Amino acid sequence: GIMKGEKNEMKKTLDEMTLEELWMLFPILLKEYNPLYPVWYEEEARKILATVGDVFRVSHIGSTAVEGLLSKPTVDILLELTPRADAEKAARALKGEWTLMSESEDPWKLSFNKGYTPDGFAEKVFHLHVRRAGDWDELYFRDYLRENPSVAAKYALLKRELKEKFERNRDGYTAAKTDFIKEMTARARLCYGTRYRPKLRP
């Protein structure tokens, strides 16, 4: 047989894998709520605040921020920087600990991850969304689910259905949730007004 050391050398890095290979390695997992999610978030938030300057707000978003909600075991973090911040400088500061997932044309919309390894998911998996301080939908959606357990239950049901359909197609899974998220976010904004609009001096 192949010795263990040799086997590892043959293993592809994530960069070398096709999208299909990545989806096989990182299928959509839905897990019951883990009470450690907020703790993991706090640990990472502290590290981020110690690493990046000009931070306006750090928030725990996504389903792991809603107690009791079925979710992919990925802690989503929204990092909002002040208007005077330098997005590229922030990205450089994060690159030691985090892997850049997507760069859009807009340097202010960066996604990073942590916990994706060539062997699959690590115990703790994070997505970090870096943006300019703003009135972001994700904060409203999160609060609406937290404050309306029946809506959260409906969302969990939808996720279970979609997981059956899109287990190996992360993009399809995400797109199929969009209508529900949009509708609930619109309701949340009606309820909450401008709860998260930054009150920034120019």
Label each PLM-derived region with a short phrase:
Residues 47-77, 81-85:
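Active-site nucleotide-donor binding segment shared across nucleotidyl transfer reactions
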Residues 20-25, 68-72, 120:
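Short, flexible turn/loop "capping" segments at secondary-structure junctions
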Residues 132-202:
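Catalytic cores of NTP-dependent nucleotidyl/adenyl transfer enzymes across multiple folds
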Residues 89-97:
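Short amphipathic alpha-helices in soluble, non-transmembrane regions
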Residues 5-59, 182:
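Helical scaffold of the NTase/Pol beta-like nucleotidyltransferase catalytic core
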Residues 98-133:
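Conserved catalytic core of two-metal-ion nucleotidyltransferases
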Residues 56, 70-74, 89, 107, ...:
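Short connector loops at helix/strand junctions that flank enzyme active sites
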